[in-house]
Swiss-Prot record:
InterPro entries: M3A_MIP, MetalloPept_cat_dom_sf, Neurolysin/TOP_dom2, Pept_M3A_M3B, Pept_M3A_M3B_dom. Keywords: Hydrolase, Metal-binding, Metalloprotease, Mitochondrion, Protease, Transit peptide, Zinc. The gene is oct1. GO terms for molecular function: metal ion binding; metalloendopeptidase activity. Cleaves proteins, imported into the mitochondrion, to their mature size. While most mitochondrial precursor proteins are processed to the mature form in one step by mitochondrial processing peptidase (MPP), the sequential cleavage by MIP of an octapeptide after initial processing by MPP is a required step for a subgroup of nuclear-encoded precursor proteins destined for the matrix or the inner membrane. Residues 31-54 are annotated as: Disordered. This is Mitochondrial intermediate peptidase.
């Protein structure tokens, strides 16, 4: 998450270098003890993907990571060994979180530290005090984030209601305090004095300068500079927007809840579903929300029924449209109050795009680059129908084409693909890939009692080529009752340099006190300073392995890509270790944050990467070249059926988002339906008919208009950049495991976190010889750079059946 000024988004007890060396020796002994248990099953053909000069412990780690995810028996032995030898610890090693009451202590201790920093900043008067101000405020932000980010995660993921409630209270306490700080004018005044003083700013590192500007921007966004009356209006508008947005997202409603048709006209729809919705008088009530209308549009043969269901399912209630239009008006007024011409201009001012005009340039350029592919797809569907295609025909004829393809091309091989994608082999493949590209790998680590929130959570330590510990990942990947099903990456604590002053302060407070609350730290070998290491949680909802041997959790190709996507976010956190937490890892511009994760999806099915991990769970046979080619043909075939039209739909949504949020505050009431149809008529190849009464108003179901207001373009923007990097840096897969390509990407993009302008990252990784970056045209960004990214296009990648 990113609150304003002090922005939240994690460590074993602090030790000296000698202690770290002892710990490494202990880890090596532990790994050796598992060497026998981790060996391949008898009869398996073992192909060694580890370099010949690799250490024995590295080979054991490589096999162990597969077993801890695939074998419940092995996992029980592995996890219980630490449980019988270690003292209990707190959640994610946080020394306070050994019980629900610990959340209150954690929040209060952090609050006291925050208050001490605030007092120091407000009292600053000497040159030296102003020179430490950027770091002081970054530490203040970190203290808030420590509580807010971790509590926010635990209250959602922990199965114990008492822990959930305690985490919620800690979250609320610190969030309320953060809001107080965001309106503390003295902090803003002092920071501005520091920035304006050349004798201060000249002593700051580039990171400190960037963080200072970020904090000033955050203060500005909280209306801190406004007179009291205007500030109160700002607060009121913000509250109104929050309430309207929540209602808009949580209460979508169609104008009609159902469409009544003759039951006999539903031929093609599953007869069991027809029976569920059939009424006594031979009619059927087709609901206009949920799965049934989507299935009807795919399968009902009668075009008139499809038309009626389509129009009704895309027409919102007047009440829902009123919520949206009030939300847009309030946002426009908020922007005007803040000195911006529109909400889009306010939101985009610190993004790569900078302005709504630049986003529109990107999107219209993307429409042009996608148009030929769309026409090809629609022509194929029109030929199937034999007459002009209508919007309500698309899903129906796409489904027919997919079924034809499946019957004619899909072989038994494709249905067997998940047999080669056990969760353990995929995690093993990720570790091998990271080792090849970036010189880091994933090492299973036994968690201490109390460290994880559920017994099936696996802990992975990330280590570099010198076996130095650089990050912690908690993998909560298996399904359980009441667990949120959506895959996600959470940064529980950002990386950051811990000053000697903080270490001394901790020692003076309490013998048991720890400068990182007990969570993972390491000594930087270059600067000899203590660092808090990034601590990450990956959450998915995969099936558990069989309890007593047998079949592990097998993933579909889509699930493999999802896991690679989330690990792309984690990689950004792992390698983007800055000295200040405000710009570490994924804390970058919204329209740059998805680049590492989207790019990682390309690696998932690249042949050279598949050779690192895709092996049959039972026989250990590798995925054959023929099967890899079949997967590629399958993706290409599905992409050619509907990939470009799906891309156009995403582009259209982004254009609608920009149109809504670029309206000036004094432009009067917004007719969201008229604007939606104007955009669709200009840019959609298959727009909704505008002459129906009432006209369709699909925008009422577009919940992302609240959460991603003015930034919905970000994902497809990063997709376009990722496609370019995949082609030009990683050779469209030919250099997918090439160390030079990986180092180039790490050096120019990942290691900076949010400490470098995104355009500089893109220009740097492409290099000056790349035609798209001729004369360094991308470095400064701007309208033409946005158009250039639009010309790169989206292709049809990412589509699989």
């Amino acid at each position: 998450m990113k609150p304003q000024l002090l922005t939240p988004l994690r460590r074993r007890p602090w030790t000296c270098r000698q202690c770290l060396q002892r710990l490494q020796r202990l880890q090596q002994q532990t790994r050796r003890s598992f060497e026998t248990a981790a060996s391949p099953a008898p009869g398996h053909t073992q192909v060694d993907y580890i370099p010949a000069d690799a250490s024995q412990s590295k080979k054991v780690d490589d096999e162990t990571i597969r077993r801890v995810f695939d074998s419940q028996h092995f996992w029980r032995e592995f996890s219980q060994r630490r449980s019988t030898q270690s003292k209990p610890t707190g959640l994610v090693q946080n020394q306070y979180l050994t019980s629900p009451d610990g959340f209150r202590t954690f929040a209060n201790v952090s609050l006291q530290k925050c208050q001490a920093i605030v007092s120091k900043v407000l009292a600053a008067s000497t040159l030296e005090e102003y020179r430490t101000m950027a770091r002081d405020l970054d530490r203040l932000s970190d203290l808030l984030c420590r509580v807010i980010d971790l509590s926010d995660f635990i209250r959602v993921i922990h199965p114990d209601p008492r822990v959930q409630e305690a985490a919620t209270q800690a979250y609320a306490l610190m969030f309320e305090y953060m809001n107080v700080l965001n309106t503390t004018t003295g902090l803003n005044d002092q920071l501005k004095k520091a920035v304006a003083n050349p004798e201060v700013a000249s002593h700051w590192t580039e990171e400190e300068k960037i963080v200072a500007q970020i904090l000033i921007k955050d203060f500005s966004n909280s209306a801190i500079l406004m007179p009291p009356q205007e500030r109160q209006r700002f607060v009121n508008l913000s509250n109104d927007i929050s309430q309207l947005g929540s209602s808009f997202v949580n209460s979508p409603e169609p104008a009609k809840s159902q469409v009544v048709v003759n039951a006999n006209s539903l031929r093609g729809l599953d007869p069991m579903l027809v029976q569920q919705i059939k009424r006594w008088n031979r009619t059927a009530s087709v609901p206009t929300t949920g799965m049934i209308p989507r299935l009807a549009l795919r399968s009902v043969h009668d075009e008139s029924v499809r038309r009626e269901v389509y129009l009704a399912s895309r027409t919102s209630s007047a009440r829902q449209l009123h919520r949206l239009e009030e939300l847009l008006l309030k946002r426009a007024e908020l922007a005007k109050l803040s000195g911006y011409s529109s909400f889009g201009h306010m939101t985009l001012s610190d993004k790569m795009a900078k302005s709504p005009e630049a986003v529109s340039n990107f999107l219209t350029s993307l429409v042009d680059s996608n148009r030929t592919l769309v026409r090809e797809e629609l022509l194929q569907l029109r030929n199937m129908k034999g007459s002009p295609l209508q919007p309500w025909d698309h899903a129906y004829y796409v489904h027919k084409r997919v079924m034809q393809y499946s019957q004619s091309r899909r072989s038994r091989e494709l249905s067997a693909v998940p047999e080669f994608f056990s969760l353990g082999t995929v995690m093993q493949g990720l570790s091998r890939l990271f080792d090849r590209l970036y010189g880091v790998r994933l090492v299973p680590q036994e968690a201490a009692p109390g460290e994880t929130w559920n017994p099936d959570v696996r802990r992975l330590d990330v280590v570099d080529e010198a076996d130095r510990h650089i990050a912690v990942i908690y993998c909560d990947l298996f399904s359980r009752p009441n667990k949120h099903p959506n895959p996600a990456h959470f940064t529980l604590r950002c990386s950051r340099e811990i000053s000697a002053t903080e270490v001394a302060e901790c020692a003076s407070l309490d013998q048991s006190s720890h400068p990182n609350d007990g969570m993972a730290t390491a000594v930087d070998p270059t600067t000899k300073t203590l660092r808090q290491l990034p601590t990450i949680a990956l959450v998915c909802d995969f099936a558990e392995p069989a309890a007593h041997g047998g079949r592990p959790s097998l993933l579909s190709e889509h699930s493999v890509r999802t896991l690679f996507h989330e690990m792309g976010h984690a990689l950004h956190s792992i390698l983007g270790q800055t000295r200040l937490q405000s710009i570490s890892g994924t804390r970058c511009a919204t329209d740059f944050a998805e680049l590492p994760s989207v790019l990682m999806e390309h690696f998932a099915t690249a042949p050279s990467v598949l050779s690192l991990y895709a092996r049959h769970w039972e026989t250990d046979e590798p995925l054959s070249e023929r099967m890899i080619q079949s997967m590629e043909r399958d993706r290409t075939a599905h992409g050619s059926i509907y990939g470009a039209v799906e891309n156009e739909a995403q582009i259209l949504m982004a254009l609608v988002d920009q149109e809504y949020h670029s309206r000036p505050a004094d432009g009067g009431r917004i007719d969201s339906t008229a604007l939606y149809h104007e955009v669709a008529q200009r840019h959609s190849s298959l727009p909704d008919p505008a002459e129906t009464a009432p006209p369709t108003s699909w925008q009422g179901f577009f919940g992302h208009l609240y959460g991603y207001g003015a930034t919905y373009y970000s994902y497809i923007f990063d997709r376009a950049i990722a496609n370019k990097l995949w082609a030009d840096v990683f050779g469209a897969g030919r250099a997918a495991v090439d160390r030079a390509a990986g180092e180039r990407y790490k050096t120019e993009v990942l290691r900076w976190g949010g400490g470098r302008n995104g355009w500089q990252c893109v220009a740097g990784v492409l290099g000056p010889s790349n035609a798209s970056n001729a004369d360094g045209r991308l470095v400064e960004g701007g309208d033409e750079a946005m158009r250039e990214v639009g010309r790169w296009g989206l292709g049809r990648d990412g589509v699989s059946g």
